[in-house]
């Protein structure tokens, strides 16, 4: 079965996220575990944790279908020692928050060298950062998200993702989330069934589909290889409906969270329904 949802708000408490996902007809969802614009956050209360778990059970959401995202402030490849240490502490805290919620995945952007160090050095730093977080948490998989190739952000090629994974000590606790807009912006074609098959095959040969833990389903506002992260509603961008039909029908997408981050939350319910229709609606 395909598990399709969106990145929902935690306003009013993290326990509200499952209910918001259910309201839009989602069978998976993503969320932040705290205010993503702040470094620090109070610990999750026992009441919020219990309510979150109860609401997930009531709405039928399993841990493997929930894809929390870490703060955008974190840079696990920072060339600045103080900022790197701050990022590592924040990322470890996010892993521990996910663990406390009874979840098993944490999605994150790899990191940026800020044009102050080499690519290989930054990839090594990112891997070391992930290893530190894994050593200080339990049962949570760190899920690398591919990037668009914008600026000095790393993770926009399958080779870079593979280089990070190669250095992770516990490979049972590392995975990948493929963002379709980022893939397309980085130069991986997704417009036809043939292109989708070729891109998945290339990922499998370089990284391995066994690491795929989720996807972000976003159309692209700009054309192939733009190196710019500009999301568009499904079917309204340069990837188009044919591309998303091929993606949603690909066997690699079975039973992993497929998360919308498209720009109009008011139509998420319609986009979810449209994607299910593309898949043949096997709910």
Curated annotation (Swiss-Prot):
Cysteines paired by S-S bonds: none
Catalytically driven reaction(s): Endonucleolytic cleavage to 5'-phosphooligonucleotide end-products
Keyword hit for Zinc: yes
Lineage top rank: taxon: Bacteria
EC class (word): hydrolase
Binding site for Zn(2+) 2: 145, 179, 216, 261
Cofactor note: Binds 3 Zn(2+) ions.
Biological process annotations from GO: base-excision repair
Keywords: DNA damage, DNA repair, Endonuclease, Hydrolase, Metal-binding, Nuclease, Zinc
One Pfam family here: AP_endonuc_2
Binding annotation for Zn(2+) 1: 69, 109, 145
Molecular function GO terms recorded: deoxyribonuclease IV (phage-T4-induced) activity; DNA binding; DNA-(apurinic or apyrimidinic site) endonuclease activity; phosphoric diester hydrolase activity; zinc ion binding
Cofactor names: Zn(2+)
InterPro entries, alphabetized: AP_endonuc_2, AP_endonuc_F2_Zn_BS, Xyl_isomerase-like_sf, Xyl_isomerase-like_TIM-brl
EC number, UniProt record: 3.1.21.2
Keyword Metal-binding part of the UniProt annotation: yes
Binding site for Zn(2+) 3: 182, 229, 231
Function, in words: Endonuclease IV plays a role in DNA repair. It cleaves phosphodiester bonds at apurinic or apyrimidinic (AP) sites, generating a 3'-hydroxyl group and a 5'-terminal sugar phosphate.
Annotated family: Belongs to the AP endonuclease 2 family.
Protein name per its UniProtKB record: Probable endonuclease 4
Source organism per UniProt: Prosthecochloris aestuarii (strain DSM 271 / SK 413)
Lineage: Bacteria, Pseudomonadati, Chlorobiota, Chlorobiia, Chlorobiales
Gene: nfo
């Amino acid at each position: 079965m395909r598990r399709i949802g969106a990145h929902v708000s935690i306003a009013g408490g993290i326990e509200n996220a499952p209910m918001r996902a259910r309201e839009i007809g989602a069978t998976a969802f993503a969320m932040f575990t705290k205010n993503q614009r702040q470094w620090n956050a109070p610990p999750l209360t026992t009441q919020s944790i219990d309510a979150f778990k109860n609401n997930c059970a009531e709405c039928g959401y399993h841990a493997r279908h929930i894809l929390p995202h870490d703060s955008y402030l974190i840079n696990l490849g920072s060339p600045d020692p103080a900022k790197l240490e701050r990022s590592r502490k924040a990322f470890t805290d996010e892993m521990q928050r996910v663990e406390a919620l009874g979840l098993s995945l944490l999605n994150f952007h790899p990191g940026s060298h800020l044009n102050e160090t080499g690519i290989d050095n930054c990839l090594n730093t990112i891997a070391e950062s992930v290893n530190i977080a894994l050593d200080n948490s339990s049962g949570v998989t760190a899920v690398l998200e591919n990037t668009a190739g914008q600026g000095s952000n790393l993770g926009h090629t399958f080779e870079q993702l593979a280089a990070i994974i190669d250095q992770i000590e516990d490979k049972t606790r590392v995975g990948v989330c493929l963002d379709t807009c980022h893939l397309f912006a980085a130069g991986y074609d997704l417009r036809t069934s043939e292109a989708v098959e070729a891109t998945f095959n290339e990922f499998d040969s370089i990284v391995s589909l066994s690491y795929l833990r989720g996807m972000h389903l976003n159309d692209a506002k700009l054309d192939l290889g733009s190196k710019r992260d500009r999301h568009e509603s499904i079917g309204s961008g340069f990837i188009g409906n044919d591309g998303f039909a091929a993606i949603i029908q690909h066997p690699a997408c079975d039973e992993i969270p497929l998360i919308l981050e498209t720009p109009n939350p008011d139509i998420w319910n319609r986009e979810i329904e449209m994607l299910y229709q593309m898949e043949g609606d096997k709910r």
